[in-house]
A protein has these predicted regions:
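Hydrophobic alpha-helical transmembrane segments of multi-pass integral membrane proteins
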Residues: 1-468
């Protein structure tokens, strides 16, 4: 098993090209490609697979729109499509980002790139088989898929854990990754129980309880905790917001971690009033954690040096609003009980689709174009005309996809809460259209090889400038 060289404890001197005034963004984000980061193939294959799952998930929303409008969240079709977003899009993107950002955020390289590729080769097809197996009620595909997912997750957790052992300065980002990986492991165990229950039914009346616990551990303990930790480094980097008060990140992580554990205990215990009280305490802590994260993000945005937000940061900011909306709905969901299925579905839809997915799309718009620029144009600086990072995609198209995705997410929530199937399906089509534009943007970034390629597909300079 090959091991990547360790990252020097002293920050490397910026390369000569970073002093050139041609493209300011590579300077601001040069840390994303510092010494010790893996070859771009490792994060690249994860990002490419994540996009495919995002496409599949967005098309699946159109398919399951009537079931969503009816609040049928226990439907195997809904479960299959949901896993395209949770495992395929969110988790796959986080895996790829972790490999690239460990040297940046913690000063250590990934323990083994080869193990990273092994993890990907098991996890990606595993998610595809599992999601399709759940949606089609195929026990064989589910079993094969979950076995491959187990291999992929195990390889990743061990690989990252061996990397985390080398970290000298164990700050909030280190803590966030440790907490998130712990919840990822718990998420997988509970998911395996639910998958087994589909065939055997051994959970009986516990199925909905275990499902609710599984969902909250996955979305809050794994995805949101990781987002809080990574954003602690990425948002100041992207916003040029150094000097902001950063104490709210640790408060968010502590509240979220404790809240998810207590909420899970409250959900799975059956001691009447005591169980309900524990659940409410867990929810209160989670709400505090979300508020702390929103405050921290707001402080970063307020301290930014660039007054105008680019498309990626506007996607992320919009995602934060949806996260806040979902959090505001949570107490009503808990108070209403499991009988209000459409309210439950709306709550998850706002948080998963409008919140987490849109926020990660915003980070995608920041990370992938920069990595593509480094791979294609770094060595051509000063030799010929090269595009800036911002010119790798169209800001006009990016804002259109944001409008479509946000309007579609809001429309789907309205369609579900009112039970109007047609509205839910039309809104799902808007989401899918936004995803199609987003993927076309990333494809343009990936395929560009020269300034001419960028210019041929660009928008009018004056139009583009208004969105910069």
């Amino acid at each position: 098993m090959s091991t990547a060289p360790p990252v020097p404890s002293v920050a490397p001197r910026p390369p000569a090209w970073s002093a050139r005034p041609v493209s300011p963004r590579p300077v601001a984000m040069a840390g994303l490609a510092m010494e010790g980061t893996p070859s771009l193939r490792l994060p690249g294959e994860h990002f490419a697979a994540a996009l495919l799952f995002l496409i599949a998930g967005s098309l699946g929303l159109i398919w399951i729109a009537p079931e969503l409008a009816a609040g049928l969240y226990l439907s195997p079709h809904v479960a299959g499509v949901t896993h395209c977003f949770t495992l395929g899009w969110l988790s796959m993107t986080i895996f790829g980002a972790m490999y690239q950002l460990l040297p940046v955020a913690l000063g250590v390289s990934i323990h083994s790139e080869r193990a990273g590729h092994v993890s990907f080769c098991a996890f990606a097809p595993g998610v595809a088989l599992f999601a399709f197996g759940v949606a089609s009620s195929s026990e064989a595909l589910r079993n094969i898929g979950i076995t491959l997912i187990a291999i992929g997750v195990t390889c990743l957790v061990i690989n990252v854990a061996l990397s985390l052992r080398k970290v000298a300065d164990r700050d909030v980002i280190w803590g966030a990754i440790v907490i998130a990986l712990s919840f990822l492991t718990l998420t997988f165990v509970m998911g395996a129980l639910l998958a087994r229950n589909i065939h055997s039914g051994f959970l009986g009346g516990w199925r909905v309880t275990v499902l609710a616990t599984h969902l909250h551990v996955a979305l809050l303990g794994w995805v949101l905790v990781m987002i809080v930790g990574i954003s602690h480094r990425l948002l100041p980097m992207f916003l040029l917001a150094h000097g902001a008060d950063t104490r709210w990140t640790s408060r968010a992580l502590a509240s979220l971690a404790a809240g998810v554990v207590i909420l899970a205990i409250g959900l799975i215990t059956t001691h009447g009033a005591a169980s309900g009280m524990i659940t409410w305490v867990g929810l209160l802590l989670i709400e505090c954690g979300v508020v702390c994260f929103l405050i921290q993000a707001g402080l970063f945005f307020r301290a930014r040096k660039r007054p105008r937000l680019d498309a990626g940061l506007r996607h992320a900011a919009t995602g934060l609003f949806f996260i806040a909306a979902s959090a505001a709905l949570a107490p009503l969901v808990l108070a209403s009980g499991p009988e209000h299925r459409q309210l439950d579905t709306t709550y998850v839809l706002l948080g998963l689709l409008g919140g987490l997915t849109l926020y990660v799309i915003g980070q995608f718009y920041k990370i992938v174009p920069f990595l593509a620029w480094m791979a294609r144009f770094r060595n051509e600086m000063g030799k010929k005309r090269v595009p800036t990072v911002a010119q790798l995609y169209s800001p006009l198209v990016a804002h259109i996809d944001l409008a479509l995705f946000a309007a579609g997410s809001l429309g789907m929530a309205m369609g579900v809460i009112t039970g109007i199937s047609l509205l839910t399906r039309i809104a799902a089509m808007l989401v899918a259209s936004g995803v199609a534009l987003f993927v076309s943007q990333i494809a343009r970034v990936a395929l560009a090889t020269s300034f001419r390629d960028i210019g041929a597909a660009g928008v009018q300079p004056q139009i583009a400038k208004t969105f910069e």
